[in-house]
Amino acid sequence: MGMLRWGVESLQNPDELIPVLRMIYADKFGKIKPKDEDRGFCYEILNLVSRSFAIVIQQLPAQLRDPVCIFYLVLRALDTVEDDMKIAATTKIPLLRDFYEKISDRSFRMTAGDQKDYIRLLDQYPKVTSVFLKLTPREQEIIADITKRMGNGMADFVHKGVPDTVGDYDLYCHYVAGVVGLGLSQLFVASGLQSPSLTRSEDLSNHMGLFLQKTNIIRDYFEDINELPAPRMFWPREIWGKYANNLAEFKDPANKAAAMCCLNEMVTDALRHAVYCLQYMSMIEDPQIFNFCAIPQTMAFGTLSLCYNNYTIFTGPKAAVKLRRGTTAKLMYTSNNMFAMYRHFLNFAEKLEVRCNTETSEDPSVTTTLEHLHKIKAACKAGLARTKDDTFDELRSRLLALTGGSFYLAWTYNFLDLRGPGDLPTFLSVTQHWWSILIFLISIAVFFIPSRPSPRPTLSA
């Protein structure tokens, strides 16, 4: 049924066909499979706990793959501990605070999590530790520091519970995602592929994390509120308290109107980070690092657009509020330069603006929503005016390669057919035949396999 649905969607959206095929290729053949057992486990479990991040991590420059892979797995393990509502607070809080010490302890392992892959990650955690200890001292220092800061922040909020104010909400998101942006910036600089100026823009790194985290928190309402043995609640009381006495009330269809107003205000709050994300991405110098940063941000804006004024958030399941596979693939393979990023953000902002004016014109937060969208549009239009679109150049090169390979294959068969089997020595005939097929296959590879975009000049914020 899934393949049939994808086939129908491809016919309806033919511009998504090639990106989907490229994504399938990356998923099947782009996975890193180290011979070393411990590294092999790390990349295997990475592909299981996060397919989307796994793809972009494995497309990073070689010197960054292991550090970022381990960084992700360490924080995923920490997040699994925080999310496990079966762990008593008296046990969880010290574990969160001390987790940064566990990442260098070869004997540490534990049972936690509600999904088999997360359980397996923590059960076989010594393999992650083994690879962590092979990283450079600077990389280990960065990962340990961010883990410590995140763990302490998570522990603080075990005590605090539901964030009261938007400031509390921002602080929580800083601890669980903003510091990740800071750590990644430090790893980029430590690799030598990014100038140190990036680490001086900590506020922008923080906005990158907050934009992603808030999108996830909004989308995951239904899953979090129904968590057992106790719900997880991250929406700030300052927002939902305007519309309900309890966050769980939004599940009741009788409260749909209030739920939608609350949801739209939550989306509005997340939108204020988008302009800063564009500023951060304009500072990235290495094209592969750019892809790594840009793709999740584009997906987040797309998902946020789906969440806006969408009551499915409160009725579930989470999969109901998800970008189509074709849309995901198209965004993934067209978010490879600043021109494309400005274009995607502008497109999302313009579509949301139309919905604000038609669907939610009476919404209590719509004026603020439109203000944020106008800022995003202005930043994108200014960015488009000063950057070059090289998308067509890449497409033209790919089409030229595919056309040339096809022409050569056709010419070869026509040539051999005209000559006849006895006019050429068998060796030359066979060589010509297989050489033409090889060139044709290479042309197909050039057309489908993801390329490395050319570096962009750094833009002023």
From Swiss-Prot:
GO BP: farnesyl diphosphate metabolic process; sterol biosynthetic process
Membrane-related topology note: Single-pass membrane protein
Coiled-coil residue windows: none
Cofactor(s) the record lists: Mg(2+)
Enzyme class, first EC level, given as a word: transferase
Cellular component, GO annotation: endoplasmic reticulum membrane
Major site of localization recorded for this protein: endoplasmic reticulum
Pfam families on file: SQS_PSY
Upper lineage: Eukaryota, Viridiplantae, Chlorophyta, core chlorophytes, Trebouxiophyceae
Single GO term (MF): squalene synthase [NAD(P)H] activity
Entry binding sites for Mg(2+): 79, 82-83
Gene from which this protein is expressed: BSS
Function: Converts farnesyl diphosphate (FPP) into squalene, a precursor for sterol biosynthesis in eukaryotes. Does not possess botryococcene synthase activity.
Origin: domain of life: Eukaryota
Name assigned to this protein: Squalene synthase BSS
Catalytic activity: 2 (2E,6E)-farnesyl diphosphate + NADPH + H(+) = squalene + 2 diphosphate + NADP(+); 2 (2E,6E)-farnesyl diphosphate + NADH + H(+) = squalene + 2 diphosphate + NAD(+)
